[in-house]
């Protein structure tokens, strides 16, 4: 009997109490899943495997689930499976119904009010299924899954909106924009 996937809530609580960080890695094929989980096993580290929209399109949901199930069985590590940057309710629902233990709903391209409404909808569904939800407030510059957010269109998270957003949505965690960016960059 293999260990089940765990939620990020359980992981974060243990990490907070133990004073350590947990790596979150985007995966899209067997070699990446194996490399990450084998490295984590060497140091007995819990980890979060993240799946983007591009990875779901490339590798397909069923294949990714089997890879992650094999990783949990092979390593015996606490592993959470997280949807990275879900863009709408439908994608979040599909991942929740399909066995993910955590989803991110990225409503940051919407108005503050619409972001709250969308995030709240995902939270209500996810929490009924024991799934953790990460929201996003503010927009990171850069490129991720062919979504290009220019520096002009990026926005820092407004600290004055954070408390209201968390209270109104019920999110379990929050991604904020504080000057970080997505993508691979070549430095000269």
Language-model segment annotations:
Residues 1-2:
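Short, Lys/Arg-enriched N-terminal segments with co-localized hydrophobic residues
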Residues 19-21:
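Terminal or standalone catalytic/regulatory effector modules within metabolic enzymes
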Residues 6-14, 29-55, 61-78, 86-188:
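Alpha/beta enzyme core
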């Amino acid at each position: 009997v293999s260990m089940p996937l765990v939620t990020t809530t359980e992981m974060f609580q243990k990490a907070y109490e133990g004073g350590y960080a947990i790596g979150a890695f985007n995966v899209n094929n067997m070699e990446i899943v194996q490399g990450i989980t084998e490295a984590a096993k060497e140091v007995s580290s819990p980890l979060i495997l993240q799946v983007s929209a591009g990875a779901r399109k490339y590798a397909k949901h069923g294949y990714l689930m089997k890879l992650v199930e094999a990783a949990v069985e092979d390593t015996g590590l606490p592993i959470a499976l997280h949807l990275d940057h879900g863009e709408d309710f439908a994608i979040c629902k599909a991942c929740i119904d399909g066995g993910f233990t955590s989803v991110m709903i990225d409503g940051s391209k919407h108005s503050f009010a619409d972001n709250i409404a969308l995030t709240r909808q995902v939270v209500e569904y996810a929490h009924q299924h024991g799934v953790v939800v990460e929201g996003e407030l503010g927009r990171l510059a850069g490129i991720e899954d062919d979504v290009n957010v220019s520096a002009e269109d990026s926005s820092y998270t407004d600290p004055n909106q954070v408390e209201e957003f968390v209270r109104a949505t019920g999110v379990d965690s929050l991604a904020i924009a504080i000057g970080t960016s997505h993508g691979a960059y070549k430095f000269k």
